[in-house]
């Protein structure tokens, strides 16, 4: 390799490292150009990430999916679905902070909510819907009366923070489990689209 080529390659590589972090945000490109839909999620261990991708599949892939930790710019999207993993009846702090900071911009765009919660392996009841949506996400966004769904989640010890894992393992007979179902997430995506007709 000649010095000139080496120098050019080195400059390009250095330039690539200086690109803004947002350019590498977790964005799933839809099957159509100019997507009008976005899903914004907050997750601790990845369950809500998977639920978001599966919801987008149920919406025929016309959705871009964003992790709130990437601090995405959602201004170009017409419709937004918001959701996240739940611990002690709340979503991750990053999602709460984002929704609070962008409440005015998002309120009229939100078209659905979802929550992923292990719920101690118990069936979901109206109590969870009231706690997660009416008492939490709706208060953060101001958007109410929208399609909402609570999905049972999963526990993977290796993905949990040590203190949370220790607390969860202190419950009798608590073991790893996975109750998140792709078919339920996809059906909810279809429900959101149907509500727009």
Where are these regions (language model features)?
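A short, well-structured beta->alpha microelement
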Residues: 61-72
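Short glycine-/small-residue-rich Rossmann-like dinucleotide-binding loops
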Residues: 85-86
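FMN-binding flavodoxin-like domain, especially the glycine-rich phosphate-binding loop
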Residues: 25-35, 50, 57-62, 89-197
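N-terminal export signals
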Residues: 4-26
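Structural motif
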Residues: 78-79
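A short, aliphatic-rich alpha-helical micro-motif
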Residues: 74-75, 106
């Amino acid at each position: 390799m000649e010095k000139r080529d080496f120098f050019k390659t080195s400059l390009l590589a250095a330039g690539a490292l200086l690109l803004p972090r947002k350019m590498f945000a977790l964005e799933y490109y839809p099957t159509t150009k100019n997507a009008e839909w976005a899903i914004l999620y907050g997750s601790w261990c990845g369950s809500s990430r998977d639920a978001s991708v599966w919801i987008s599949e149920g919406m025929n892939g016309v959705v871009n999916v964003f992790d709130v930790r990437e601090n995405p710019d959602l201004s170009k999207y017409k419709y937004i679905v918001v959701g996240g993993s739940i611990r002690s009846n709340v979503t991750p702090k990053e999602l709460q902070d984002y929704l609070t900071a962008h409440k005015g911009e998002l309120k009229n765009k939100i078209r659905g909510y979802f929550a992923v919660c292990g719920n101690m392996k118990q069936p979901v009841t109206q109590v969870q819907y009231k706690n997660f949506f009416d008492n939490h996400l709706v208060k953060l966004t101001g958007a109410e009366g929208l399609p909402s769904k609570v999905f049972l989640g999963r526990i993977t010890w290796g993905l949990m923070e040590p203190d949370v894992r220790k607390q969860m393992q202190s419950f009798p007979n608590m073991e790893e489990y996975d109750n998140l179902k792709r078919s339920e997430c996809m059906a909810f995506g279809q429900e959101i689209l149907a509500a727009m007709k």
